[in-house]
């Protein structure tokens, strides 16, 4: 996961979502409300599983004519066996992977209300 992350990606730390503030080989730092930036260990952060609830928080719209299919600003995702995949068979398992894919596709950050 370390090499998948970008600044502003969301991860779990202490079972709470935080955004990555900076990245180095030794450690990442997180943006926190309590004390600004916080340095943590790589082993202490984990990906946030991508769920239907999160897709709604990303302004996703469930497509009524498909089972488990969402549209997030023109990107169509289908829930298949515990992961989401884009219409071109790209497996997306976590929020940070979707953030990166969205940025690559749309050239802008994904809006999320966590």
Predicted regions and their residues:
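Short intrinsically disordered terminal tails
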Residues: 1-5, 108-114
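Short, solvent-exposed secondary-structure boundary motifs
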Residues: 8-12, 52-58, 64-72
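Acidic, low-complexity, intrinsically disordered interaction modules
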Residues: 23, 27-43, 62-95
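Intrinsically disordered, low-complexity, charged/polar segments
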Residues: 36-62, 95-105, 114
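Compositionally biased amphipathic helical and low-complexity segments enriched in hydrophobic
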Residues: 6, 13, 31, 56, ...
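Short beta-strand-centered aromatic/proline hotspots
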Residues: 3, 9-10, 16-33
């Amino acid at each position: 996961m370390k090499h998948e992350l970008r600044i502003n990606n969301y991860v779990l730390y202490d079972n709470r979502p935080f955004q990555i503030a900076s990245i180095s080989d030794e450690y990442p730092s997180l943006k926190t409300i309590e004390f600004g930036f916080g340095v943590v260990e790589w082993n202490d952060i984990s990906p946030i599983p991508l769920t239907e609830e999160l897709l709604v928080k990303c302004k996703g719209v469930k497509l009524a004519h498909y089972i488990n299919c969402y549209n997030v600003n023109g990107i169509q995702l289908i829930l298949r066996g515990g992961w989401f995949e884009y219409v071109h068979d790209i497996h997306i398992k976590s929020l940070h992977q979707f953030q990166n894919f969205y940025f690559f596709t749309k050239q802008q950050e994904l809006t999320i209300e966590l």
